[in-house]
Amino acid sequence: MKRIVLFTWLTPTIDNICGPSALAYHTLKNRPDYYDLVIYTTNYNNISAETIRLISKEINAEIIIVRDDIYNYFHRRHTFAELRLKLRLDTSYGQSNYRLPKKYISQIRCYDPDIVIVFDEAFVKVARQLSNYNLIVWGYDCFPLHYSRLMRDSYCFSENNLYKQILYKYKVAIFRELQYEDIPCRIADVGIEDVNYYKIITGRNNVSFYPHPHYRVIDRNISFNKQKLKVIISGKFDVYTYSDMNKLVDVLKKHCNALKDKYIFTFLGKTWRNIVSELKLYGFDINNIDWVDEYAGELVKHDIQIFPISVGSGTKGKVLDALSMGLLCIGSNTAMENIYVRHGHSCFQYKDVNDIPAFLNYIYNNKGKAEIIAENGRNQVLTWHNPKRVSKLFLEDIDESTGLKYDGYKEYNKVVNALKSIL
């Protein structure tokens, strides 16, 4: 039996409660049987003790809540942290300064793991503490790439001084990556451009791309044989969707006469209310749902999902959700990056928001082809983003005893380049 230790600031949950990604949950839950797992979590997302016990059973792992020592108390929770932040003495608000208390280091030493994973590149000192093991620092994306893209987006200029704040965060993110220079470890990301950007800013090659696993799947029949097709837009109207969503509202208004009798639009989330009210004035059949307890159950009531994502990096788990459940997905290049799909074969990928009405009209007038594209999207994700497959190749690649070498970049390009559009 091989032994794995995971350190994470967020307790892994099936639907990434109060966190950016459920990557760790789904990858490690689906690990091969010969890997034992112990998780050390600071439980920053405040998951209840009862829920943690359930998660422990679901993923077959021991979960240990890390309690702060005096050092971390002053670096994370004490009011001095606010003062240091203002003086720019502690730019990460404690994450880069966070240390795993000695008690837990001793426990890990006794456990003698074959693999140690630090989830989130922000925890530099924890990585340094655990660098004498076979260490992988696992991130959902490269933070400097995110901020680099954000600085080119109109969101930066939506408020006074916002650009300066983002530029400052960009510099902090680069500094954090450079801190790994003398730490013997490997870096894992779920983004090809994330990997490339990391190499550019650090000059190091100790970083690899791995595909992101899909989450839960609900089997459904794909059928567009109906008078009105159902479209869903979920998530939030925030930094990630600000620019493209504002453009999409204007584009939908312009094409309302061609679309309003063909589609029912549903916006899932509280932040869409103003947009929904605005589009209702133009005669769209439109709904706004603030919250659902079962996200996947709501998703499969629809035929199409639009992802107006203008900023981001890594792989978007919500896009994988939709594709794996057979929804026909329309999204930006940013939304679809790192997913084993291709425009016209397994999704619709827009270069400009103005493309979306043409896609919607094509889908409505070519429902048979649209069903094939949706089915192709589902098959691609269920095959290449299968959690058991991803977990096995990820763990066996970083397990030094296997001798296996996985090239995610080569695999991705080979698979996607072989896909042919049916448009």
Predicted features by range, described:
Residues 1-24, 41-43, 232-237:
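Nucleotide-activated donor-dependent transferases that construct or modify glycoconjugates
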Residues 136-137, 167-219:
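Donor nucleotide-sugar binding/catalytic pocket of nucleotide-sugar-dependent glycosyltransferases
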Residues 300-314, 325-327:
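Acidic donor-binding loop of glycosyltransferase active sites
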Residues 318, 328-332:
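Short hydrophobic beta-strand element within catalytic cores of glycosyltransferases
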Residues 369, 378-423:
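C-terminal amphipathic helix plus adjacent low-complexity
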